[in-house]
Amino acid sequence: MFYIYSIIFSLNFNFKLRGQRGPAGVNFSSHSGSRLHRNCFNISAKEILISVRASFSPRHALRPPWNPVTAHLFFAILQFFLMVSISEPHLSGLKSSAVVPQVLGSCEVPKLLYPTYTPLGITISAPNLHVLVVHLLIIVLKGGYILTTSKRKAFNKGKSAKPFGSVMPFTSFLSFSCHSFEYLARR
């Protein structure tokens, strides 16, 4: 459920597209009265589908099929499947041989054998270190995409770039922090 909530948070915080329009003319600007951003619960499914369909239209064939909506949807779905396949291998169909029974009283409780890392000769048994690494990679991917697109847009408009502006990848840092606390708590 945590990963599902992460996607919801991603859609909620990454739709801060003040005054921007999708390629199909879909307006993601703020409310007329309060001037607050529209979150994922205010954006209808039809608007999202129109924006996604327009990003893959033939007139976009010579450039990557990205707009802010499809980009963050892609990264949110990628993050979800990576986290499930790495931290929950039995759900993704991967064969997990890292489960051995641990006898407690009269019942057997499965115990996970987490991978060990030996940086500088120090052995670390890390339950979620590999998950943290994947989170860092996703943060770099999202940050790199946002940085390059903001620079390109600023160059086209003759303005200075605002790297993370209104599309800060909040959910990656939220998920990374949660896994960090979980990792430290299990040590």
Swiss-Prot record:
GO terms for cellular component: membrane. Its main location: membrane. It is found in: Membrane. The chain crosses the membrane at residues 66-86, 120-140. The keyword Transmembrane helix applies. It is a multi-pass membrane protein. Keywords: Membrane, Transmembrane, Transmembrane helix. It comes from the Eukaryota. Partially overlaps DIT2. This is Putative uncharacterized protein YDR401W. It comes from Saccharomyces cerevisiae (strain ATCC 204508 / S288c).
